[in-house]
C-alpha cells in the first residue's frame, strides 16, 4: 500500500511541477508581447470578459493567467506535502516501529472522522422537522435503541465497586476447562424443587384417609392396576420374535467351512473339492453294486456276511488301509453280480494274500483274470472311504480333534467315539448285502448322522452337509435301523 501511495504522490508532484512550469512560460510570453506593445488593450479585454465560474463584481475578478498561476502554486505545494508525508512514512517503516504506524493511522482516521458532519440519527416513527425530533403527547422524546448483532450472546455483568476486568484471552487446555466446569457447577442456581416453601400450618387429611372403606377401595384398585401392567420390554421381545417367525427369519446354525484347515495343503486341492464330489456322485451310479442273491445258486446272505466278517478281522490284524477294504468288498459284490460262483471258490476271491499257501499260484492267477475280465478292468471307483472322510470333516469343528480323527481313520483305530460309531455302522453296512447295495454317500451320511445325534450337533451338521448331499435324501429311518442292535448281525 505504501508503495502505491509513493507512486501516486510522485505523480501529483510531477503534475504540479508541470503546471507551475507552464504558467511561468505563459507569463513570460505575456510580458514579451506587452513589451512590444502589440496587445495594449489586453487588460481592457480581460476586464470586459465575463467570468463563467464566479459572478463577482468587476473589481474582484481575476484574470485567467492569475488563476492558472494560483492553481500551479497549489498543485506544487500539495505535491511537496505528499512527497514529504511519504518520506516520513517510509522512514517509519524502515525503522520498524509498528506501534508508531498504528498510532499514525489512528490519528489520520480520527482527523477524517472529525471532518464529517454529525448527522442526527433518525428513529422510525420520529421524523425530523428542522433537525428536531417530534415529541409525543407527554412531552417525552421517542428514543429507540439501535439493533446490534443478533446472536446467542449473554452480556457479562460488570464488577461492582471496582474496575472492569479485561476479558481472559488464553487457550482452553484440559486443566483450564476442568476449572471452568467446576466454577460453573458452584455458581449454578438451585433447582426449583429444592426451594420448598415451609408449611404454614397442618394440612387437612384427605377424605380417603379419614374414611377406612374408601382407603381400602383405593388400595384394591391400585393392586389390580399393578397386576394388569406388564413390562414393555417383554411384550416388545415377544412381538419381534413372532414377526420374525411369521416372515421366516429364524436363527439358523452357522454353516462351517470344513475345508478351511486344508487351504494351505496343495495336495488336498481345496479349489476343486466341489467338482470332485459332484463327479464322485455321478460315477457312483455306474459302480454301485446291485442285488445278486437271486442269481447265486450255492450261496446266500449269511455266507457273504461270514466272508466279509472274516475279511474285517484280517484287515484289522494286518492294519491295512481302510480304502482297500471298501474297494475289495465292492469288487466282490460286482463280480458276484455278473457271475455265479460255486461255494468252494468263494473264499478264493478276496483272501488270496492271507491263505498262507492254501491255494496254488495258478489258481490265484486264474481267479484274478476271471475277476478283471468280468469287471472289464473297471476298478477305480469312489468308495465309502471318500464320503466317510468328508462327513467326518463336517462332523468335527475343532481342527486339533479333526487331525486326530483323520489319523485314526487312516490307521483304522477306533479309540474315539465318532470313529467307533462310524466304523461300527460302516462295517455293518458292508456286512449286510441289502445295505451295501445302496448309495455309498447315503450309508456314510447315515453313520455320521448317528454320531452327531449322540453328540447333540445334529442341526449344525445338517446345515453344513446340505451342500454335500442331495436335498431329497432322507435317512432317519436307516439311522434307527443301524443303531437298533448292539453288534453286527448277519441277517
Swiss-Prot record:
The lineage of its organism: Eukaryota, Viridiplantae, Streptophyta, Embryophyta, Tracheophyta. It comes from Arabidopsis thaliana. The gene is CYCB1-5. Pfam families: Cyclin_N. GO terms for biological process: cell division. This is Cyclin-B1-5. Belongs to the cyclin family. Cyclin AB subfamily. Residues 275-347 form the Cyclin N-terminal domain. Expressed in roots, stems and flowers. Gene3D superfamilies: Cyclin-like. Keywords: Cell cycle, Cell division, Cyclin. SUPFAM superfamilies: Cyclin-like (SSF47954).
Amino acid at each position: 500500500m505504501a508503495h502505491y501511495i509513493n507512486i501516486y504522490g510522485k505523480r501529483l508532484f510531477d503534475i504540479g511541477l508541470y503546471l507551475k512550469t507552464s504558467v511561468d512560460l505563459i507569463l513570460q510570453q505575456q510580458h514579451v508581447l506587452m513589451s512590444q506593445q502589440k496587445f495594449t488593450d489586453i487588460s481592457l479585454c480581460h476586464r470586459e470578459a465575463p467570468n463563467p465560474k464566479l459572478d463577482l463584481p468587476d473589481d474582484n475578478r481575476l484574470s485567467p493567467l492569475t488563476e492558472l498561476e494560483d492553481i500551479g502554486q497549489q498543485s506544487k505545494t500539495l505535491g511537496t506535502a505528499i512527497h514529504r508525508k511519504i518520506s516520513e512514512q517510509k522512514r517509519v517503516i524502515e525503522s520498524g516501529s509498528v506501534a508508531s504506524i498504528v498510532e499514525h493511522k489512528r490519528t489520520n482516521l480520527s482527523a477524517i472522522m472529525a471532518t464529517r458532519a454529525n448527522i442526527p440519527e433518525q428513529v422510525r416513527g420520529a421524523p425530523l422537522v428542522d433537525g428536531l425530533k417530534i415529541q409525543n403527547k407527554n412531552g417525552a422524546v421517542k428514543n429507540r435503541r439501535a439493533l446490534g448483532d443478533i446472536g446467542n450472546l449473554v452480556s457479562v455483568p460488570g464488577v461492582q465497586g471496582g474496575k472492569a476486568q479485561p476479558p481472559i484471552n488464553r487457550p482452553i487446555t484440559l486443566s483450564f476447562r476442568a476449572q471452568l466446569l467446576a466454577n460453573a457447577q458452584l455458581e449454578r442456581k438451585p433447582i426449583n424443587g429444592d426451594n420448598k416453601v415451609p408449611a404454614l400450618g397442618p394440612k387437612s387429611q384427605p377424605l380417603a384417609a379419614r374414611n377406612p372403606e374408601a382407603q381400602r377401595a383405593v388400595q384394591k384398585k391400585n393392586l389390580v392396576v399393578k397386576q394388569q401392567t406388564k413390562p414393555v420390554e417383554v411384550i416388545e421381545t415377544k412381538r419381534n420374535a413372532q414377526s420374525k417367525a411369521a416372515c421366516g427369519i429364524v436363527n439358523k446354525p452357522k454353516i462351517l467351512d470344513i475345508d478351511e484347515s486344508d487351504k494351505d495343503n496343495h495336495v488336498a486341492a481345496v479349489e476343486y473339492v466341489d467338482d470332485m464330489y459332484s463327479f464322485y456322485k455321478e460315477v457312483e451310479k455306474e459302480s454301485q453294486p446291485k442285488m445278486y442273491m437271486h442269481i447265486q445258486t450255492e450261496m446266500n446272505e449269511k455266507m457273504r456276511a461270514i466272508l466279509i466278517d472274516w475279511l474285517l478281522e484280517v484287515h484289522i490284524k494286518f492294519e491295512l488301509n481302510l480304502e482297500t477294504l471298501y474297494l475289495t468288498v465292492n469288487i466282490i459284490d460286482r463280480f458276484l453280480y455278473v457271475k455265479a460262483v460255486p461255494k468252494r471258490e468263494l473264499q478264493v476271491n478276496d483272501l488270496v494274500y492271507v491263505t498262507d499257501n492254501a491255494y496254488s499260484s495258478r489258481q490265484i492267477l486264474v481267479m484274478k483274470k476271471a475277476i478283471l475280465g468280468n469287471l472289464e478292468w473297471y476298478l477305480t471307483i469312489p468308495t465309502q472311504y471318500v464320503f466317510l472322510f468328508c462327513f467326518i470333516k463336517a462332523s468335527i469343528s475343532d481342527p486339533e480333534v479333526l487331525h486326530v480323527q483323520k489319523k485314526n481313520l487312516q490307521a483304522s483305530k477306533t479309540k474315539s467315539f465318532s470313529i467307533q460309531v462310524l466304523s461300527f455302522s460302516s462295517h455293518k453296512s458292508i456286512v449286510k448285502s441289502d445295505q451295501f447295495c445302496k448309495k455309498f454317500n447315503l450309508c456314510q451320511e447315515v453313520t455320521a448322522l448317528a454320531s452327531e445325534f449322540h453328540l447333540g450337533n445334529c442341526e449344525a451338521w445338517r446345515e453344513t452337509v446340505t451342500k454335500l448331499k442331495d436335498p431329497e435324501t432322507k435317512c432317519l429311518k436307516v439311522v434307527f435301523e443301524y443303531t437298533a442292535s448292539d453288534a453286527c448281525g448277519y441277517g
